A protein has these predicted regions:
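Boundary/linker segments flanking structured domains
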Residues: 1-51, 59-65, 76-218
Length: 221
């Protein structure tokens, strides 16, 4: 049976696409969603200078993640000042911050490394982290890191951003495939969009026999 989850959201400037802080009931971690143009305004929030990890993202036309960068911060939103000067791609920052007891240096280092590895595995978007952290996650810390990442993944999903591996979410019920006319393709429909999966193939040397395409071709002669 699925477990219900309660979230509290504050829209700090009264706009649905403005600065938001999100807290899951009984969690020690707070999420801050910060549009880049509002970075200076976000610095005025209480608790936003705590340690944690963050995502810098840009979106495509469908409001899905197109590019992503993941980092750690020991002083909260102040870390974004460097990225505001040096990284041009991002439009929004999403920060996951907590107190020092929850997010020790080892914890945020392990969480950063884990999140970057998951982003590469997801194959959903371009990951801007050119160097993977060499931090080795202690086996005793891993269960807590996985638990925190699961919460991060859930919060991101509530904001419309899927972090999970695309192929791991597929099953026979929602996967479609075709092998006709030189095409070997697999895809999935999520209720809104149809996405062709990586590895699909099409033989471009085969002639198109579509009646519709032939009519279109004749109409432009």
């Amino acid at each position: 049976m699925a477990i219900s989850k309660k979230l509290e959201i504050i829209y700090h400037n009264g706009q649905p696409d403005g600065i938001r802080s999100i807290r899951r009931h009984l969690s020690t971690m707070t999420t801050y969603v910060i549009p880049r143009p509002l970075l200076s305004e976000a610095k005025k929030l209480s608790g936003i200078n705590r340690p944690g990890i963050y995502y810098l993202i840009s979106e495509d036309e469908d409001n899905k993640i197109a590019q992503i960068y993941i980092g750690q911060t020991r002083n909260g939103v102040v870390r974004l000042d460097d990225h505001n000067r040096t990284k041009g791609f991002w439009k929004k920052a999403i920060m996951f911050l907590a107190d020092n007891k929850t997010f020790s240096l080892d914890m945020i280092s392990g969480l950063e490394a884990y999140a970057i590895a998951k982003a590469h595995d997801a194959k959903r978007y371009k990951v801007e982290n050119s160097v993977n952290p060499k931090y080795e996650i202690d086996e005793y810390d891993l269960p807590l890191i996985e638990e925190v990442y699961e919460e991060i993944q859930f919060i991101m999903a509530t904001q419309g951003y899927k972090l999970d591996n695309l192929k791991s979410t597929l099953n026979e019920a929602n996967t479609l495939h075709t092998t006709r006319n030189g095409i070997l393709a697999f895809g999935v429909y999520d209720g809104e969009h149809f996405e062709v999966l990586e590895g699909s193939e099409i033989d471009m040397s085969r002639k198109c026999h579509s009646v519709t395409m032939e009519k279109i071709g004749r109409a432009h002669v």
